[in-house]
Amino acid sequence: MTTKPSDSVSWFQVLQRGQHYMKTWPADKRLAPVFPENRVATATRFGIRFMPPLAIFTLTWQIALGGQLGPAIATALFACGLPLQGLWWLGKRAITPLPPTLLQWFHEVRNKLAEAGQAVAPVEQTPTYQSLADVLKRAFKQLDKTFLDDL
């Protein structure tokens, strides 16, 4: 994944964009064979929910049994770092420009929205995966479910 050099964002902004991208991406099974976002978002949501309690349990378990503190902390940090890796990947993916094949598909979906009478904002810069997620989410809400079959 390559990003534009002008897209220098801080690591915290990348995590925030990843969370926004995860919430925006439509969780439709028909997109799963083409895009890994469904799997990454599912794993990240799972990690956000279950890894912090697992880290606390692991830490208290090893301390209670008289284990060493170093490995206990390392295990807890590893468990808490897993969801951050998912958010990081999603954030980087969100700011990545679309490749030419997806760019064409992006414009086809936008045209379908425009043909259906929906107001579509003009594209001001190179569309990214976040732009694609926004368009797909809107298309799934406002178009019939067969719009993917025509593309």
Curated annotation (Swiss-Prot):
InterPro entries assigned: UPF0208
Keywords: Cell inner membrane, Cell membrane, Membrane, Transmembrane, Transmembrane helix
Keyword Transmembrane: yes
Location within or outside the cell: Cell inner membrane
Metal-binding recorded as keyword: no
Membrane topology type: Multi-pass membrane protein
GO cellular component, one term: plasma membrane
Signal peptide: none
Chain segments annotated as transmembrane: 46-66, 69-89
Top-rank taxon: Bacteria
Family annotation (Pfam families): DUF412
Similarity comment: Belongs to the UPF0208 family.
UniProt protein name: UPF0208 membrane protein YE1335
